[in-house]
């Protein structure tokens, strides 16, 4: 499952930027890194790079033509990929993940600060990073044409996409190119037999279409296999009853007259194919740790019957019913985020699976509560055990998972510094996730309020989603946002609402029903 990003394009007005800045203070998000942290990381980065070429701990894999694929403008590059054909219609997947443990001394200043932060927090006007930029955007980032230490996963997939073999080693790698999703999608659309759209694809520019002309053949051959890997892994997901929820990115664009316009950008197929590589790696990491009896999983319980019933009712209200007997994953895959009703369902689906967290276990721990792996190790939405293992530059727990998995893969004991941290990691990640979620929710309220400020007094169309004690939840069709409107209207009713006021400081939006027969106003 992936969450949507919230972006800001254009010169936002000072009031919005000031409010977003204040949000950091209100949520007590960390600001600048302390001097000892920066000094320690500078020294660590220098030491790692000086010693990397002769490091006995890192195999030389610099001849492999890895590339990174990320959103445009990214500098914290965690992952690089290489795909090659194998015998019997198989595909060999190599996935390099930044070796952050090489740069962070256990118990040091950087480690302590990372535990305090937990994860990178993304806001419309920037981010609050987990690590100092000298690490996350330079020394450990898999930037092109630079040797970097990495954990290199190797997966041999059969013709159906099942994993036949798994390998993991620490290695030196050198990415050949830093590519964007738009560039890769343009390249894939131009391949023989590709089902390219007849109209320009949103998120792909003319510059993206021209970029592939300079790629070497080995890079082109690798990326040409990405859709097939994505399709095979998606088929495996469907077969086990799993589902990935890929929400559109929400973006606020500033128009020439200074108004804020809210738009949604659905993930490109290349993004969804690439996401399957991270899911593949996370499931392999979980299997390794469960087999070894030491690890930390990303767990999520199955939804209860009341939650499922409420979600089904909401889908019916929106005119996109999830029928009894229809597989949940197949239902999600049938939705088109470009349709406002379908988009509302996708957002509602985020509330179906609740209770996600981290579960640590260690068969040799002194604490009896840690000695037994979880009774239900699966991440319910994925229908498989899963671990976070592919974003160590941006998420604390991945650093520990990667170190554990490497030890398990080579038959070495689990590192003592990891085992000692396992009891505390679930709470550290839960705390940082609460801060990140609060920041995301509040920032979304602020930018949605900014987008609706120019619509005060306007009447907008929407759909009544559900009735509540304090009014009716309405999903506006354009812009696609959710509002609470005083009054009562049956779920599923097409309605009109008037935007009566916007509080830019709080992000609150006041609206009233227009000609609602049951309205209280």
Residue ranges and their predicted role:
Residues 2-24, 36-495, 500-509, 518-521:
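Electropositive polyanion-binding surfaces
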Residues 31:
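Alpha-helical structural modules in large enzymes and assemblies
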